[in-house]
């Protein structure tokens, strides 16, 4: 595909919101607040921000550079920039990672739809804490209901993708992201109005530098890496739709700020509500689907209508956060098939959706009726999570650093960062230093930590 034929995002704000939508996901809500509250509050946030700017942004800019300069999807970008070399496998790695993640991530995304329905039917009312445990375990192991929601969620994602870059991805981002922001701000306001909310606020934001140690730095580095959707090709694919006027540095900064802003606000929803009823939240799916429904019912027990509204809004928020992520993951694979095999966009999208439904169905069933079928003592859901999050993404991020930092000509990076010399790049040498030396070491440490070796 020639550069002149490639569709670009129609506006700068559309590009920023699309990239931010790729970064904002369920991890912002179920992992970041827990990490922050248990690792020094504001002290962790400061360490995390340092990691975002010293680790996350250099890699993000590197991925943006690859995407815009090649004007190709992640799967083809490295063939364009390094023809006749083995670097093409880095592009294929990103496509495969995106495909596998979309397959099992859509299972969890589908759960949010079940909980929107459950909340909307007032199904959380009058339940005891143990009832939420039983309800979630029963639902997640059900051989039918999760599959229905999985298919619905993937079809919603498919609908956006087949509309194309401008009419699908950009338009949806301009709607979904503002709605997400409004929902999260309203929910924060409700949560902070609860009795004893200040205890949760203190737990989340009061700096405790005595807790800052090596583990905290590793946790902050890992959170920054995974939260910003690095290493999976989403950002470089979106960057291939950036216009020449898009400022890569400013866009990366905007994405980092928005992603962190959403994560902190998620904490301001969860902790004040939880502490108002004397519950200390955990992390992961159990936080979202077991702990929080119980918290919301108890926190607003005096005004049941508020418990109802709060619960519905919260799960709509989760679904929107998941959808912006599944759209970007789907686009990585669809764009590759569209360009590499000259398929129509619609046919490429159908292949991706169908393939992910198959992966999603098996992943979902591996939590229930097929849980006895394992590989390396893991069902498919847990195996895909392990292989992608702990191996493929860190490896992809590391190779991006090496490719842009060492293989690609510095003049290419300079040209992209300065928009052909039109912008100043006073921090260019620092960017190259971080990309060549700091980010690779950090990723190797993340890789080792995720594998449980340190």
Language-model regions, residue ranges each:
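Membrane-embedded translocation segments of transport machinery
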Residues: 2-5, 9, 170, 174-323, ...
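A generic transmembrane alpha-helix motif of multi-pass inner-membrane proteins
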Residues: 379-402, 424-454
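Extracellular loop-to-transmembrane helix junctions
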Residues: 36-62, 145-146, 392-396
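Membrane-interface "cap" regions at the ends of multi-pass membrane proteins
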Residues: 1-30, 59-64, 68-81, 85-92, ...
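Inter-helical loop and helix-membrane interface segments of multi-pass membrane transporters/permeases
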Residues: 3-7, 35-39, 69-93, 106-162, ...
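Transmembrane helix-boundary motif of multi-pass solute transporters/channels
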Residues: 11-51, 199, 239, 250-253, ...
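Loop-to-transmembrane helix boundary motifs in multi-pass membrane proteins
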Residues: 8, 13-14, 22, 147-148, ...
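Select transmembrane alpha-helical segments in multipass membrane proteins
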Residues: 8-19, 44-47, 86-99, 148-153, ...
């Amino acid at each position: 595909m020639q550069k002149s034929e490639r569709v670009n995002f129609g506006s700068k704000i559309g590009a920023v919101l699309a990239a931010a939508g790729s970064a904002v996901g369920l991890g912002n809500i179920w992992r970041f607040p827990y990490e922050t509250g248990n690792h020094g509050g504001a002290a962790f946030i400061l360490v995390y921000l340092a990691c975002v700017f010293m680790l996350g942004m250099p890699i993000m800019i590197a991925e943006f550079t690859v995407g815009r300069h090649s004007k190709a999807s992640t799967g083809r970008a490295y063939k364009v920039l390094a023809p006749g070399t083995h670097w093409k496998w880095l592009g294929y790695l990103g496509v495969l990672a995106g495909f596998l993640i979309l397959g099992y991530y859509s299972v969890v995304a589908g759960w949010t739809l079940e909980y929107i329905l459950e909340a909307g039917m007032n199904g959380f009312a009058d339940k005891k804490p143990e009832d939420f445990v039983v309800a979630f375990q029963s639902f997640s192991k059900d051989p039918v209901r999760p599959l229905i929601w999985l298919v619905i969620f993937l079809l919603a994602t498919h609908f956006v993708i087949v509309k194309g870059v401008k009419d699908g991805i950009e338009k949806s981002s301009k709607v979904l992201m503002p709605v997400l922001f409004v929902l999260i701000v309203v929910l924060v306001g409700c949560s902070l109005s609860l009795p004893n909310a200040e205890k949760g606020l203190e737990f989340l934001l009061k700096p405790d530098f005595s807790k800052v140690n090596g583990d905290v730095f590793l946790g902050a580095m890992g959170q920054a890496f995974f939260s910003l959707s690095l290493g999976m090709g989403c950002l470089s694919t979106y960057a291939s739709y950036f216009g020449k006027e898009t400022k890569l540095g400013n866009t990366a900064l905007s994405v980092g700020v928005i992603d962190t802003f959403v994560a902190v606000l998620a904490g301001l929803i969860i902790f004040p509500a939880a502490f108002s009823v004397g519950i200390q939240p955990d992390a992961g799916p159990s936080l979202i689907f077991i702990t929080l429904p119980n918290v919301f019912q108890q926190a607003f027990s005096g005004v049941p209508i508020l418990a109802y509204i709060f619960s519905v809004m919260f799960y709509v928020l989760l679904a929107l956060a998941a959808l912006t992520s599944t759209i970007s993951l789907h686009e990585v694979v669809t764009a590759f098939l569209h360009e590499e095999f000259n398929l129509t966009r619609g046919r490429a999208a159908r292949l991706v959706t169908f393939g992910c439904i198959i992966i999603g169905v098996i992943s979902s069933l591996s939590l229930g009726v097929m849980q006895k079928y394992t590989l390396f003592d893991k069902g498919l859901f847990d195996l895909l999570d392990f292989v992608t999050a702990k191996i493929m993404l860190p490896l992809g991020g590391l190779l991006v650093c090496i490719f842009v930092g060492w293989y690609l000509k510095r003049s290419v990076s300079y040209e992209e960062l300065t928009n052909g010399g039109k912008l100043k790049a006073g921090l260019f040498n620092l960017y190259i230093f971080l990309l060549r030396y700091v980010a690779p070491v950090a990723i190797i440490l993340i890789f080792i930590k995720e594998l449980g070796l340190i």
